[in-house]
């Protein structure tokens, strides 16, 4: 993917505008979007200080998979404050057992620098299942 950050950003913005109009998609004040895929059984929401265990599958808006705990077959645990802003915010809306698709604008992800396989200014999509909160 050799597109410029500006091109990625514009395509991401266009994607988010169209995506935001879809049924069930919620757009928050920050620009994060999410869609509940499966309701959870929990009642508590994680806070920014929580440690969570999740399964996730991350793609670019063109469907390219860049990271997936699902494909590795092993969930991941982390402190919420250690991850990108889109996850910090998105996971606070979730409860245990819930599956959500997060649509994360680049400014809430890796921004202009990108990261590894993630190009500059890329909008990211993550399917996240919240397994547990500690």
Task: Please place each PLM-identified region on the residue numbering.
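Cross-family detector of peptidyl-prolyl cis-trans isomerase
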Residues: 1-134
């Amino acid at each position: 993917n050799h597109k410029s950050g500006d091109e990625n950003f514009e395509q991401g913005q266009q994607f988010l505008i169209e995506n935001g109009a879809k049924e069930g998609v919620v757009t928050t004040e920050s620009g994060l979007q999410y869609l509940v895929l499966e309701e959870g059984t929990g009642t508590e929401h994680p806070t920014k200080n929580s440690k969570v265990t999740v399964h996730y599958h991350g793609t670019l808006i063109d469907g390219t998979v860049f990271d997936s705990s699902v494909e590795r077959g092993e969930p991941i645990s982390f402190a919420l404050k250690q991850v990108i802003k889109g996850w910090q915010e998105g996971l606070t809306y979730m409860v245990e057992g819930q599956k959500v698709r997060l649509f994360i604008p680049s400014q809430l992800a890796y921004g202009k620098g990108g990261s590894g396989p993630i190009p500059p200014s890329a909008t990211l999509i993550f399917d996240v299942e919240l397994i547990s909160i500690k």
